[in-house]
Regions:
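Extended two-metal-dependent nuclease catalytic cores across DNA- and RNA-processing enzymes
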Residues: 42, 83-229
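Non-catalytic, usually N-terminal nucleic-acid engagement modules in DNA/RNA processing proteins
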Residues: 1-92
């Protein structure tokens, strides 16, 4: 891997203050917590509950293991992302059509894959998530703009001990101690393969990565731009 990582057990983070990229983890819950045909979990009135299920069960487990969580929600997206957000919207619409076609054809595997590509985070889901976090006693904050940037800012101000996200942008924003796979379950299916891999939390050490790569953060950002991610 490009960056220096170290696999850990959740228990190793006991007592640590961790800022979690809220939008990232909610998308993760909405993508992965689904039924066999790709449909989202719903209550008796048809309201989506996948995001709430993820928050309740997975965050509760982290708290039980002694982690002190703070969830960071995105604010207004930067204007530079306008075209990208429109491209994503169009891809989701295309995936929606392909999902419905796969269901009609009885192809449950393709249906589930396409369904995951339609994932949308609606404003009411954010409101519901914040309410559940309040009930669980887990603090949350709204970022001025990008959640990953706010996570890195909290970390660099010493207000938390680690940042957590699946998005490497958090590292590019300067998160020096970064955790991935914090809220993922133990196994994950590889895309388009009948193969499962074990997933465990891992820490990315930014300073060790810089030493290994002989780069600084500005140069790493340049590499990310050249790679298109």
């Amino acid at each position: 891997p490009l960056l220096e990582t170290r696999k850990i057990k959740i228990e190793e983070l006991s007592g640590q203050r961790i800022a979690i990229d809220g939008y990232n983890v909610l998308y993760q819950f909405l993508t992965s917590i689904r039924q066999a045909d790709g449909s989202l979990l719903t209550d008796s009135e048809g309201r989506v509950t996948s995001h709430l299920s993820g928050i309740f069960f997975r965050f509760s487990k982290l708290v039980e293991n002694g982690l002190q969580l703070c969830i960071v929600f995105d604010g207004k997206p930067p204007l530079l992302k306008k075209n990208l957000l429109e491209e994503r919207r169009q891809r989701k619409l295309k995936a929606q059509i392909e999902w419905e076609a796969a269901i009609e054809a009885g192809d449950t595997e393709t249906a589930r894959t396409k369904a995951q590509q339609t994932t949308r985070l609606e404003s009411h889901m954010i409101t519901e998530s914040k309410h559940l976090l309040d009930l669980l006693g887990i603090p949350w904050v709204d970022a001025p703009s990008e959640g990953e940037a706010q996570v890195a800012s909290l970390l660099n101000q010493g207000m938390v001990d680690y940042g957590a996200s699946q998005d490497f942008d958090t590292v590019l924003f300067g998160a020096s101690k970064f955790v991935r796979n914090l809220t993922l379950s133990g196994r994950r299916k590889l895309p388009k393969q009948q193969k499962w891999v074990e997933v465990s939390p891992e820490i990315i050490d930014l300073e060790a990565s810089f030493q290994k790569l002989k780069l600084n953060r500005e140069q790493l950002i340049d590499v990310a731009i050249l790679m298109g991610t």
